[in-house]
Amino acid sequence: MIKPLGDRVVIEIVETEEKTASGIVLPDTAKEKPQEGKVVAVGKGRVLDNGQRVAPEVEVGDRIIFSKYAGTEVKYDGKEYLILRESDILAVIG
């Protein structure tokens, strides 16, 4: 498994619908970049200038919304993941 360092978070991207409400199938080129995912691993948190560690606000299993162009896409064990900083997470869903 991927173990993120510092304030980084590993997420599994949740794919969006491939059809519009009217039933039109969207090609890959017309799809928006996904902004929703499920947290699969969390780092230990960021370290402040005084050496104190701040624990992450998200946990494994959380569904999140993140910045559109945030993070680095990686492929591991046949699955695609996104590694991003906790500050790129905009909200937790539910």
UniProtKB/Swiss-Prot annotation:
PROSITE patterns per UniProt:
CHAPERONINS_CPN10
Write down the Gene3D superfamilies for this protein, in alphabetical order: GroES chaperonin
Origin: domain of life: Bacteria
Which processes are annotated in GO (biological process)?
A: chaperone cofactor-dependent protein refolding
Decide whether keyword tRNA-binding is in the record: no
Q: Which UniProt keyword terms apply here?
A: Chaperone, Cytoplasm
* GO terms under cellular component: cytoplasm
Q: Which GO terms describe its molecular function?
A: ATP binding; metal ion binding; protein folding chaperone; protein-folding chaperone binding; unfolded protein binding
Location(s), subcellular = Cytoplasm
Pfam families per UniProt: Cpn10
The answer to whether UniProt assigns keyword Lipoprotein to this entry is no
Regions that span the bilayer? none
Predominant location: cytoplasm
Subunit field text: Heptamer of 7 subunits arranged in a ring. Interacts with the chaperonin GroEL.
Role description = Together with the chaperonin GroEL, plays an essential role in assisting protein folding. The GroEL-GroES system forms a nano-cage that allows encapsulation of the non-native substrate proteins and provides a physical environment optimized to promote and accelerate protein folding. GroES binds to the apical surface of the GroEL ring, thereby capping the opening of the GroEL channel.
Q: Which family does it belong to?
A: Belongs to the GroES chaperonin family.
Q: What's the name of the protein?
A: Co-chaperonin GroES
Recorded source organism is Parageobacillus thermoglucosidasius (Geobacillus thermoglucosidasius)
